[in-house]
Curated annotation (Swiss-Prot):
GO terms for biological process: DNA-templated DNA replication; error-prone translesion synthesis; SOS response. Its EC number is 2.7.7.7. Poorly processive, error-prone DNA polymerase involved in untargeted mutagenesis. Copies undamaged DNA at stalled replication forks, which arise in vivo from mismatched or misaligned primer ends. These misaligned primers can be extended by PolIV. Exhibits no 3'-5' exonuclease (proofreading) activity. May be involved in translesional synthesis, in conjunction with the beta clamp from PolIII. One of its GO terms (cellular component) is cytosol. One of its GO terms (molecular function) is magnesium ion binding. InterPro entries: DNA/RNA_pol_sf, DNA_pol_Y-fam_lit_finger_sf, DNA_pol_Y-fam_little_finger, DNA_polymerase-Y, DNApol_IV, PolY_HhH_motif, Rev_trsase/Diguanyl_cyclase, UmuC. It comes from Streptococcus pyogenes serotype M4 (strain MGAS10750). The active site is at E117. Residues 14-198 form the UmuC domain. The gene is dinB. Belongs to the DNA polymerase type-Y family. This is DNA polymerase IV.
Amino acid sequence: MLIFPLINDTSRKIIHIDMDAFFAAVEERDNPALKGKPVVIGKDPRETGGRGVVSTCNYEARKYGIHSAMSCKEAYERCPKAIFISGNYEKYRTVGDQIRRIFKRYTDVVEPMSIDEAYVDVTNNKLGIKSAVKIAKLIQHDMWKEVGLTCSAGVSYNKFLGKLASDFEKPHGLTLVLKEDALCFLAKLPIEKFHGVGKKSVEKLHDMGIYTGQDLLAVPEMTLIDHFGRFGFDLYRKARGISNSPVKSDRIRKSIGSERTYAKLLYQETDIKAEISKNAKRVAALLQDHKKLGKTIVLKVRYADFTTLTKRVTLPELTRNAAQIEQVAGDIFDSLSENPAGIRLLGVTMTNLEDKVADISLDL
């Protein structure tokens, strides 16, 4: 017996776009000499004493088992000839803006998930094109011609299937999952490929003898709810290709922040304040990009021994002014108890966000 009826909206046309090895691809585009070589975006461990983690890497590096969040030291051990690049995040942000402009050419119903990934609802698009596959191909064409980068596209009737489809054939792939093919498509997938199913849930599912979408399809809804609570309700529907979550072009952001981890520990106040300034300016720029203002400034400090402190100050009025954010974050730091251990991470975050109103001018 179902807790809730199975309502499956198959009328939508949704594309999930995922840029291929984005940061590394931008570096290859700007330096053709890197093509065909393993490229890792991360600090060279030979220069940092082994510290640092991989942000991303190109497909050549992935052949050696290198992946995001791996330590740079391990990445080097797996592939000593890998080329390590610290990364230029302002450049990546500029390219990300170009990418979003291409999406908006076809529809305003765009939900960015990160700088290199977005859902695009083209059910009612600006060009009146009926085929979502055609629009996906046009986006891929525009991306290559105008930005010099490739992307993979997944086309289906909901976000869940679109995301899985874009991962199915990379790089520069295009996969279509029709409603009549959804069950077959999902049945063959390992459960760990299901978007939104985390590592602990995968382990629990494996303990239940569930390894594939086909296995999951056979489990009664109440059994899944007994084991996973509310998430069991979602699992039951995902196994059937049901996910009615809308593409939210106005996703509500609860916070905007910037933080950096340092290969060399920070000890000097001048260095610390300089890094707080960089983070504050980054936050101000992001607030401007997202047309947001905020009231609460949060400073995060992580020391060499991994002790982490966060402290916040709420302002009387909304702001996105870089100098003000920097001043408040600096004052927060001054109020912390002295700690002789060096600092390995600093972060500045703005919360209590509201949309920018026309009569407030608080630009950089």
